[in-house]
Curated annotation (Swiss-Prot):
Signal peptide: none annotated. This is ATP synthase epsilon chain. One of its GO terms (molecular function) is ATP binding. Produces ATP from ADP in the presence of a proton gradient across the membrane. The keyword Membrane applies. It is found in: Cell inner membrane. It is a peripheral membrane protein. The lineage of its organism: Bacteria, Pseudomonadati, Pseudomonadota, Gammaproteobacteria, Legionellales. F-type ATPases have 2 components, CF(1) - the catalytic core - and CF(0) - the membrane proton channel. CF(1) has five subunits: alpha(3), beta(3), gamma(1), delta(1), epsilon(1). CF(0) has three main subunits: a, b and c. The keyword Transport applies.
């Protein structure tokens, strides 16, 4: 029997996942962080990106979060996400369109463009596309 910890992924709308996992990998403020049972207590900001969870038995699921907080306690990991979805439920066409729109806004030389907003939109779109691509690889 493998060593596990409890994970809750919750968005403002509803609970996305609640169950026992062997490992959680998320994109924190300083990069990817891997959490296994027995990890030291931690509180960090999440950046838009994927959350990979390894269930008992080694099966992996991929979720997309659009920022939020990750808390690690001795026997529980909690992700409070601004927005969270299973990666397979993401709309690839919409993500590609959002990426193209953000890139066009950044490339334009107009004075009425808020570059920080465009950069954040670009980061979200790229994170969604990566999550979709990893889900595709997992399904093959």
């Amino acid at each position: 029997m493998s060593i596990t910890t409890h994970l809750d992924i919750v968005s403002a709308e509803h609970e996305i996942f609640s169950g026992v996992v062997e490992m959680v990998v998320a994109t924190g403020e300083l990069g990817e962080i891997g959490i296994t049972p027995g990890h030291a207590p931690l509180l960090t900001v999440l950046r838009p990106g994927e959350v990979r969870i390894t269930l008992q038995g080694g099966t992996q699921d991929i979720y997309y979060v659009q920022g939020g907080m990750l808390e690690v306690q001795p026997h529980c990991v909690t992700i409070l996400a601004d927005v969270a979805e299973r990666a397979e439920h993401l709309d690839e066409a919409a993500a590609l369109a959002a990426k193209a729109k953000a890139e066009a806004a950044i490339a334009s030389k107009g004075g009425d463009i808020d570059y920080s907003v465009a950069a954040a939109e670009l980061a979200r779109a790229v994170a969604q596309i990566r999550a979709i691509q990893k889900t595709r690889k997992k399904m093959k």
